[in-house]
Amino acid sequence: MIKVPAYMYVLECSDGTLYTGYTTDVKRRLNTHNTGKGAKYTRARLPVKLLYSEAFNSKQEAMRAEALFKQKTRQAKLTYIKQHKNEQ
């Protein structure tokens, strides 16, 4: 069986807030958000843009990373993104 990578992603909404989620296809999910068919949170804050995505070996790992990321303060999230973007 072929393993499909899963991704944690972070969006910046039109009001400047951040939204974090997970998916197996970042481009498709971003499009879903921007067409108003994504999460209720982003529907009211369109358009959204992708700030960051990180690949994981499984959906479970991506979900765990998402949960941990959501616990961070906004500043800690932005610092994480800045530090890890340089690694990609």
From Swiss-Prot:
Gene3D superfamilies: GIY-YIG endonuclease (3.40.1440.10)
Signal peptide: none
One protein family per Pfam: GIY-YIG
Origin superkingdom: Bacteria
PROSITE patterns recorded: GIY_YIG (PS50164)
InterPro entries: GIY-YIG_endonuc (IPR000305), GIY-YIG_endonuc_sf (IPR035901), UPF0213_domain (IPR050190)
Location of the GIY-YIG domain: 4-80
Family under the similarity heading: Belongs to the UPF0213 family.
Protein name: UPF0213 protein SAG0778
Organism, as annotated: Streptococcus agalactiae serotype V (strain ATCC BAA-611 / 2603 V/R)
